[in-house]
């Protein structure tokens, strides 16, 4: 295979949506920090929704973006908590994959801490091919050619080869 056609993991994003600020959100931040050794960033609501009791610009979640070796390590940890199984519907047409884990204690090596409680989390993995910079650069950005876009099948194959994932 051509070196420029091999997909790779650009980033992995872990998100814990709490739905409210305060003590519960700080516990979720503490969990992410102990899980990946990196400080999370808070995300804020964009609109007011009185049914959920959320006001605009209120902190409701926290997330962390991982790249390189850290991303590979955390993806393999979380996938082993899911018994290395992913549905084909969890891949989008750009080749990215998103999956959730119901309870963080399902991840091997993570123990229950009564101070933190139990949280679920969403994991999103973004795939790219070399040459993606032409789309994101500041000067003279160009459209990404079709050959440099990651397809659903390519990312499925990557996950099977590198993480021993069975796709249902």
Swiss-Prot record:
| Keywords assigned | Ribonucleoprotein, Ribosomal protein, RNA-binding, rRNA-binding, tRNA-binding
User: Coiled-coil segments, which residues?
Assistant: none
GO CC term, one of those recorded: ribonucleoprotein complex
The protein's GO terms of the molecular function aspect are: rRNA binding; structural constituent of ribosome; tRNA binding
Q: Which SUPFAM superfamilies is this protein grouped with?
A: RL5-like (SSF55282)
A Pfam family matched by this chain, by name?
A: Ribosomal_L5
Task: Quote the HAMAP family the UniProt record gives.
Answer: Ribosomal_uL5_A
Functional description taken from the UniProt entry: This is one of the proteins that bind and probably mediate the attachment of the 5S RNA into the large ribosomal subunit, where it forms part of the central protuberance. In the 70S ribosome it contacts protein S13 of the 30S subunit (bridge B1b), connecting the 2 subunits; this bridge is implicated in subunit movement. May contact the P site tRNA; the 5S rRNA and some of its associated proteins might help stabilize positioning of ribosome-bound tRNAs.
Q: Self-association or partners: how does it assemble?
A: Part of the 50S ribosomal subunit; contacts the 5S rRNA and probably tRNA. Forms a bridge to the 30S subunit in the 70S ribosome.
Family as reported in the entry's similarity comment: Belongs to the universal ribosomal protein uL5 family.
- What is the protein's given name? Large ribosomal subunit protein uL5
This chain's source organism reads: Methanosphaera stadtmanae (strain ATCC 43021 / DSM 3091 / JCM 11832 / MCB-3)
